[in-house]
Each structure stands twice: as C-alpha cells, then as structure tokens.
C-alpha cells in the first residue's frame, strides 16, 4: 500500500531474487549516472488516475498487483521486491557518490520515506562514501514541520547556526506510551488470546520462537515521531 507499506517491500526482498532488475531498468525507469532518474509514465497511472499502475504495467510482469485481502504472497512477489530493492540501492548509491564528488562533504543527512531503507543506507555506509550518515526519522509529512521551523529560524529570524559534531537529537520516541493495564484492556476488547509472562519467561519464549523461524512483533515504550 502506497505511503504505508514500503517497508514491507524491503523486508520481503531478501526472500527473492532480482530477476526483474533489467526489465525494470529497460522499461520503467531511466537512471542517470548521478542518480537522477525519470519514470516512464506509460506504465503508471498515479498522475492522472486513481491507481498507481496500469494494464501496461500488469502486462509487463504478467500479473496484476496483489490483492492483500484474498491473495497470498508468492515467489513472484518476493522476486519483484528483490528487484525493486536492488534498483533502489543502485539509485541511492549513485546519488551518494555524485553528492560527494560535487560538494566534497564529509557527512550526509537523509530524510524522507526512502531514507528509511536501512538496507540501502547500510550499502552507502559500507562503501565509506561519507564519514558519518544521519537519518531524520520522521519520514512523512510530519517531518516537514522540522524543515519549516528551521527555515523560519534561519531565514526569517536570522538565527545564527550552531555547528555541533554531536547528535543533539536525544531520540525520536516522542509519541504516546501505553501502560500494561491499557494493553490488557485492548486485548480483552478484541477477544485476543494472550498470556502474561515474567521477564525471564518472556525472553525465553521469544528466543524459542525466533529459533523456530517464527516472526515476533515487539511492542514496548513510546511510539516514534513520524
């Protein structure tokens, strides 16, 4: 789902093979050496319609986008995810190299949805293009408030910039936090089956589930900003 499920594509990618990489690059996207790109709008519908892609896109890959309500994830979807992830990594690496070449900077700041692609960020970090990489965590519209505030502070109020080598952001966990009683009530209202475990037993069961190849969701503390 657009603007909410992109992280699932990154998570699904390791289970597939990038067999559609060339098809994507030959038909859907023109990538320049500096990382800039142009999408072939013949395959997309978001600029003029209510869907992201069109029938020509479906015919290119031989399938329509998956209906999450009644269609299971198949190897095809895993391979599509792996292919898109690889193309995304290529673009981000080219962007990073061209920025370094043009501006000769030691540090890189990233923001936005794609900036939360930690696999691609890891590739940039591993290549040592920059000494340090900092990612602003609020990737959606909420993050724009930070830029608006800083623009007003520096451009309108002529506030003097203070350059610091340290990360002054003390954390992104600025959202609500739920108590044990609130969590229990919510689970009861939903009719969910649940156990309340002591810390040691909880950790042991979590490790056991992970060793058995199960997926574990961990809910704790405050929600992240953005």
Question: What residues fall within each predicted segment?
Answer:
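Short acidic/glycine-rich loops and adjacent helix/strand connectors
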Residues: 1-226
């Amino acid at each position: 789902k657009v603007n909410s499920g992109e992280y699932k594509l990154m998570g699904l990618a390791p289970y597939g093979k990038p067999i559609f990489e060339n098809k994507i690059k030959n038909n859907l996207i023109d990538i320049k050496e500096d990382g800039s790109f142009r999408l072939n709008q013949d395959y997309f519908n978001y600029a003029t319609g209510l869907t992201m892609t069109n029938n020509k896109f479906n015919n290119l890959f031989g399938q329509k986008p998956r209906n999450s309500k009644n269609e299971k994830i198949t190897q095809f979807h895993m391979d599509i995810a792996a292919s898109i992830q690889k193309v995304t990594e290529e673009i981000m690496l080219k962007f990073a190299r061209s920025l370094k070449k043009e501006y000769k900077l030691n540090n890189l700041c990233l923001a936005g949805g794609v900036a939360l692609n930690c696999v691609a960020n890891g590739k940039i970090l591993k290549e040592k293009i920059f000494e340090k990489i900092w990612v602003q965590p609020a990737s959606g519209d909420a993050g724009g408030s930070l830029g608006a505030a800083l623009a007003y502070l520096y451009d309108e109020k002529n506030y003097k910039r203070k350059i610091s080598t340290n990360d002054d952001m003390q954390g992104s966990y600025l959202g609500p936090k739920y108590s044990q009683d609130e969590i229990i009530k919510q689970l009861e209202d939903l009719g969910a089956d649940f156990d309340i475990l002591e810390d040691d037993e909880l950790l042991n069961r979590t490790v056991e589930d992970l060793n058995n190849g199960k997926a574990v969701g961990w809910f704790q503390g405050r929600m992240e900003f953005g």
